[in-house]
Regions:
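Extended hydrophobic packing segments that form well-structured cores
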Residues: 147-170
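Shared catalytic-loop signature of beta/alpha-barrel
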Residues: 3-9, 15-140, 144
């Protein structure tokens, strides 16, 4: 039924902590099932990939704790013949980092997740960067080749940001 209406994949159809339920959905559908956006434990990723719980892995570079573990998940998926269409929840550094690391893997999926939530949902992302690093032209974004992550944080945004210090322990 989903494929009859042009749906090409079903993202995280079950709570992520219910992998066996997700596997049942994956086995029942003719379209790809994606998942893993909230997972950060390599044992969970290994199980997800080994058992083919999903057809497409969606690691999130921030949930994963950085580029290195993200690349490890993408590599595990590649060795298993799975594509990687990462999760990127908002228009911040998570999507900027995701755009860059997608260029570094051979099993990148055909899509880049761009948040549809605007300033009503994520008010803090308004004016975060100078320019428009997420500009879509003919269905594509251009990844900057400027130094670092290729973006510049807006100094006016920084001037109005709240700062807090956190500490572990006592």
């Amino acid at each position: 039924m989903l494929q009859d209406h042009g749906v090409t994949h079903y993202e995280e159809p079950c709570p992520y902590w219910h992998p066996d339920d997700t596997l049942q959905v994956t086995n029942a559908l003719a379209i790809n099932v994606t998942g893993g956006e909230q997972d950060c434990d390599m044992r969970v990723w290994k199980d997800m990939i080994d058992r083919r719980i999903v057809n497409i892995v969606q690691p999130d570079v921030m949930y994963m704790g950085g580029v290195t573990p993200w690349l490890q998940v993408a590599d595990m998926a590649d060795k298993a013949g799975l594509i990687c269409t990462p999760h990127a929840a908002n228009l911040s550094l998570v999507t900027i980092c995701t755009m860059h690391v997608l260029q570094a893997i051979p099993n990148a999926g055909p899509y880049l997740e761009l948040s549809i939530e605007g300033t009503d949902y994520y008010p803090w992302q308004d004016g975060l960067f100078l320019g428009d690093p997420f500009k879509v032209t003919d269905g594509h974004v251009t990844i900057s080749d400027a130094p670092g992550w290729g973006v510049e944080v807006n100094p006016d945004w920084l001037a109005t940001a709240d700062y807090a210090v956190s500490a572990v322990g006592g």
